[in-house]
Structures are given as C-alpha cells and as structure tokens.
Amino acid sequence: MKCPFCGNADTQVVDSRVSEEGDTIRRRRRCLSCDKRFTTYERIELAMPSVVKRNGSRSDYDTAKLRASLSLALRKRPVSTDQVDSVVARIEETLLASGQREVSTERIGELVMAELKKLDKVGYVRFASVYKNFEDIGEFVDAIREMQGPMLPGKLRK
C-alpha cells in the first residue's frame, strides 16, 4: 500500500480489525520510510448485474437510483433511512444471489414493490403508480385492492 504522505510503497500493517457488521476490515498501517501512520479499509467488491431497460439498452446497476426511487415513494412517510437501507440491501442480496449477469428493470420493479408492500402501503401505491404508469383513478383503486388481498364474505375493509 502506497503511503499517502511520502508516496513510498513500503508499509507495514500494525493492526487489523473486522467491523461490527463483518463486511469491512480496518487496517492501521505504518510507512517504513517516513514512519507516519494511516488507516485503510478493505471490503469485498461485489459485481452487480447489468440492468436491461425496457427499450433494450443496458446500463450499470446504480444503488443511488434505487435509493432515490424508494425515497421518493416514501417521502413524508414514517419510514426511517435505516429501513430504506435495509430494503436496498435485501434487493441487492436477491439480485446477487440470482447469479444472473443481467437483470431487467421490470424485475427490479417487482422486487421494490414486494418490499414496499411489506413496509408501507402508501409508498407501495405511490411507487406502483409510476412503475405501472397509472393513467386514471381506477388503476389506483385496483392497486389498492390487489394490495389488500381478497375480501372475505361479510367483511368490510377499513
């Protein structure tokens, strides 16, 4: 590892610790030339699949886009940033576990809707309205009915 102070390539690892989450290693290093210490972090670099858009074009997977879509759907809802981060992590784990080199935007949308359905019903309907390109109020009503599931005979929905 190259020293950030003098540029020398000879450094020594003084201490290594695994993060609480277990996904990062923090290393304290000492430069053998200038004797200054610095910290580096090491983590696994996972290769996310490429995204195939509806028009057939391909782009790199972008976590920021997923997070922005979720944040927009959940705007002014009682959902914490940690909850959004957990949803993003679960979706990314699912994509990685699939082992596919490519994933369609439709598949990502389905995963987002499944997570939002469990997390926040209003966020689900907001996301669905954009994702499914709702054009009238009937489509909103259909999405709400679908989300609520089948109605039992004699039972009224609240």
UniProtKB/Swiss-Prot annotation:
Keyword line: ATP-binding, DNA-binding, Metal-binding, Nucleotide-binding, Repressor, Transcription, Transcription regulation, Zinc, Zinc-finger
Cited InterPro entries: ATP-cone_dom (IPR005144), NrdR-like_N (IPR055173), RNR_NrdR-like (IPR003796)
Cofactor requirement: Zn(2+)
ATP-cone domain span: 49-139
Ribonucleoprotein is among the record's keywords: no
Gene Ontology biological process terms from the UniProt entry: negative regulation of DNA-templated transcription
Cofactor binding comment, as recorded: Binds 1 zinc ion.
One term of GO molecular function: zinc ion binding
Stretches annotated zinc finger (unnamed): 3-34
PANTHER family for the chain: TRANSCRIPTIONAL REPRESSOR NRDR
HAMAP family per record: NrdR (MF_00440)
NCBIfam families, alphabetized: transcriptional regulator NrdR (TIGR00244)
Reported function: Negatively regulates transcription of bacterial ribonucleotide reductase nrd genes and operons by binding to NrdR-boxes.
Family the entry assigns: Belongs to the NrdR family.
Protein name: Transcriptional repressor NrdR
Gene symbol of the encoding locus: nrdR
